[in-house]
From Swiss-Prot:
Free-text function comment from the UniProt entry: A cytochrome P450 monooxygenase involved in corticoid and androgen biosynthesis. Catalyzes 17-alpha hydroxylation of C21 steroids, which is common for both pathways. A second oxidative step, required only for androgen synthesis, involves an acyl-carbon cleavage. Hydroxylates pregnenolone to form 17-alpha pregnenolone, followed by the cleavage of the C17-C20 bond to form dehydroepiandrosterone (DHEA). Has 17-alpha hydroxylase activity toward progesterone. The 17-alpha hydroxy intermediates, as part of adrenal glucocorticoids biosynthesis pathway, are precursors of cortisol.
Protein keywords: Endoplasmic reticulum, Heme, Iron, Lipid metabolism, Lyase, Membrane, Metal-binding, Microsome, Monooxygenase, Oxidoreductase, Steroidogenesis
Species whose genome carries this gene: Papio hamadryas ursinus (Chacma baboon)
Enzyme class at the top of the EC tree: oxidoreductase
PANTHER family documented for this protein: STEROID 17-ALPHA-HYDROXYLASE/17,20 LYASE, STEROID 17-ALPHA-HYDROXYLASE_17,20 LYASE
Any one GO cellular component localisation term in the record: endoplasmic reticulum membrane
Name of this protein: Steroid 17-alpha-hydroxylase/17,20 lyase
Length: 508
């Protein structure tokens, strides 16, 4: 009896103990690890994971490994090593690990964000980038679309003059409409029931993915009942059903001679492939309806909640730092005034606002840990060997809070991105990658930067953003899920007197 138990344990240890492909190679230091459970018993159980990994650097250095269940994961916490992974050896490390929850979200690894490296991912990323090229100028210029939605946002907020509100949903609506126009030329009216559906499934997906799920570490557990997985599946189905409805309706309107949005680009690519008019890398099997819908879903998922969250973080930090907010108002008044609305060209004049956005992206990165990468081949990071199939996580929090790179990294200091005279934007450190880098960098970076600048410039021009009368300031602790969320808070919205007077003069 005991001999059989011992034999079973030895067999499990052999199967699940980390194996080195190159016995003589030098590997990163590793946390203690046990068969089956890996390093889990030795990881801190309290606090945010990104911060815990950052603290472990003091003992293990800027690169080390942990055993997450049965998989080896290398944690990278220095900008030079991170750029080696993302840029210098970007192709080596451009794979994506297979993760149960993300497989559900991506309809079995389709789309862009969570798809593994290969022909499918390359094709869909290229087509998505081609879509953004449609919005460079003319009536479809990205800035024009963004400003149209911000104008509607500001008009809605003005109806709450003097009130204390949560700006989350109004900002969500504006950004959803920008993404929706880019994807399929649809802009939702306030009160449209589909908006609520999008908002609900979006929140449900983020909440489900934010729960630490053992099934991601031990995939065999998915055979057992799992409330989190079932909830995720329900919300993904709701998303897929809505996108399918939009897609089916749009098929009747599609014209190959009028390509104006992402759905047009993807459908044209599919048509060309079906007709034999595409290159060898454009296989029609990679452009099925399911592939197309997942890519659209990726753009929605990546483009809405991220920017909405950053806008809220910016407002929260301004409520905590009224002296910065005061200077921002002065900059708006002096450089833009009230006879026109802010434009992207004002970036060159509203330097403190741009610096504030950069500082918020540093101190509260959208994703404190970038989506995990996977080694496609046997490779190396720095002096250390990394075997094919190894997972690699860039701890962006560590890069953005390194005391050797940033003066008082836990302090909100927008001026760090300005020269001493405040007349020029600077890069104070190379340890700054808010949108990632390399082959897997955020394809919506230009869109996000424009949205953040324009939304904040318009809000500051029109409204006083004040702490509620009860003095309740937002918590800056945050809740790191797929996106680093800020806890719900309220802000007192007041139409600025100078704006009101300028509008009165203009109407006479």
């Amino acid at each position: 009896m005991w001999e059989l138990v011992a034999l079973l344990l030895l067999t499990l240890a052999y199967l699940f103990w980390p194996k080195r492909r190159c016995p003589g190679a030098k590997y990163p230091k590793s946390l203690l690890s046990l068969p089956l459970v890996g390093s889990l018993p030795f990881l801190p159980r309290h606090g945010h994971m990104h911060n815990n990994f950052f603290k472990l650097q003091k003992k293990y250095g800027p690169i080390y490994s942990v055993r997450m269940g049965t998989k080896t994961t290398v944690i990278v916490g220095h900008h030079q090593l991170a750029k080696e992974v993302l840029i210098k050896k970007g192709k080596d490390f451009s794979g994506r690990p297979q993760v149960t929850t993300l497989d559900i979200l991506s309809n079995n690894r389709k789309g862009i964000a969570f798809a593994d490296y290969g022909a499918h991912w390359q094709l869909h990323r290229r087509l998505a980038m081609a879509t953004f090229a449609l919005f460079k100028d003319g009536d479809q210029k990205l800035e024009k679309i963004i400003c149209q939605e911000i104008s509607t946002l500001c008009d809605m907020l003005a109806t709450h003059n003097g009130q204390t509100i949560d700006i989350s949903f109004p900002v969500f609506v504006a950004i959803t409409n920008v993404i929706s126009l880019i994807c399929f030329n649809i802009s939702y009216k306030n009160g449209d029931p589909e908006l609520k559906i999008v908002h609900n499934y979006n929140e449900g997906i983020i909440d489900s993915l934010g729960k630490e799920s053992l099934v991601d570490l031990f995939p065999w557990l998915k055979v057992f009942p799992n409330k989190t997985l079932e909830k995720l599946k329900r919300h993904v189905k709701t998303r897929n059903d809505l996108l399918t409805k939009i897609f089916e309706n749009y098929k009747e309107k599609f014209r190959s001679d009028s390509i104006t949005n992402m759905l047009d680009v993807l459908m044209q690519a599919k048509m060309n492939s079906d007709n034999g008019n595409a290159g060898p890398d454009q296989d029609s099997e990679l452009l099925s309806d399911n592939h197309i819908l997942t890519t659209i879903g990726d753009i929605f998922g990546a483009g809405v909640e991220t920017t909405t969250s950053v806008v809220k973080w910016i407002v929260a930090f301004l409520l905590h730092n009224p002296q910065v907010k005061k200077k921002l108002y002065e900059g708006i008044d002096q450089n833009v005034g009230f006879s026109r609305t802010p434009t992207i060209s004002d970036r060159n004049r509203l330097l403190l606002l741009e610096a504030t956005i950069r500082e918020v992206l540093r101190i509260r990165p959208v994703a404190p840990m970038l989506i995990p990468h996977k080694a496609n081949v046997d490779s190396s990071i720095g002096e250390f060997a990394v075997d094919k199939g190894t997972h690699v996580i860039i701890n962006l929090w560590a890069l953005h809070h390194n005391e050797k790179e940033w003066h008082q990294p836990d302090q909100f200091m927008p001026e760090r991105f300005l020269n001493p005279a405040g007349t020029q934007l600077i890069s104070p450190s190379l340890s700054y990658l808010p949108f990632g880098a390399g082959p897997r960098s955020c394809i919506g970076e230009i869109l996000a930067r424009q949205e953040l600048f324009l939304i904040m410039a318009w809000l500051l021009q029109r409204f006083d953003l004040e702490v509620p009368d009860d003095g309740q300031l937002p918590s800056l602790e945050g809740n790191p899920k797929v996106v680093f969320l800020i806890d719900s808070f309220k802000v007192k919205i007041k139409v600025r007197q100078a704006w009101r007077e300028a509008q009165a003069e203009g109407s006479t």
